[in-house]
């Protein structure tokens, strides 16, 4: 039984469409707990640094532009196998490929406005959470 933390980011399209609660319902219905949450407006430098691993990809500048186009909601999720579970409920990166019943399959508009970011590994979850949160903001026993 692996109790884990993972990072979730609700992207600007979620806030613009006023569907934060709808996305949170998917998270809560999966059994994951939202133990920390805050709304931020990322600067270009912050977005570039957060997504630095994608720097050489063709979509990098578009991703940075999207992530700085409005507020985001960053969350720390906690639960059994949280990284894997959240990746499953998110669905495929391209909403066209995402299964129904997943966040992206049900509510994402496009690959650019694909609703959420979720950590892809336990190691990246640790790095990504620390990018946005101090330990005191999310320590959960």
UniProtKB/Swiss-Prot annotation:
UniProt keyword annotations, A-Z: ATP-binding, Cytoplasm, Kinase, Magnesium, Metal-binding, Nucleotide metabolism, Nucleotide-binding, Phosphoprotein, Transferase
GO cellular component terms attached to this protein's record: cytoplasm
Subcellular location: Cytoplasm
Subcellular location, principal: cytoplasm
Disulfide bonds: none
GO annotation (BP), single: GTP biosynthetic process
Domain of life: Bacteria
EC number(s) per entry: 2.7.4.6
The family this protein is said to belong to: Belongs to the NDK family.
Subunit comment: Homotetramer.
Protein name: Nucleoside diphosphate kinase
Upper classification of the organism: Bacteria, Pseudomonadati, Pseudomonadota, Alphaproteobacteria, Rickettsiales
Gene this chain is encoded by: ndk
């Amino acid at each position: 039984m692996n109790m884990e933390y993972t990072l979730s980011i609700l992207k600007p399209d979620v806030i613009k469409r006023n569907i934060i609660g709808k996305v949170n319902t998917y998270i809560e219905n999966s059994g994951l707990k939202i133990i920390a949450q805050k709304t931020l407006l990322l600067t270009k430098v912050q977005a570039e640094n957060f997504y630095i691993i994608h720097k050489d990809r063709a979509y990098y500048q578009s991703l940075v532009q999207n992530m700085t186009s409005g507020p985001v909601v960053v969350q720390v999720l906690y639960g059994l196998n949280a990284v894997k579970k959240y990746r499953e409920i998110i669905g495929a990166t391209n909403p066209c490929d995402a299964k129904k019943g997943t966040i992206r399959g049900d509510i994402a508009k496009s690959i650019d406005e694909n609703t959420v970011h979720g950590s892809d590994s336990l190691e990246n979850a640790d790095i990504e959470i620390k990018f946005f949160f101090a330990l005191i903001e999310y320590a959960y026993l």
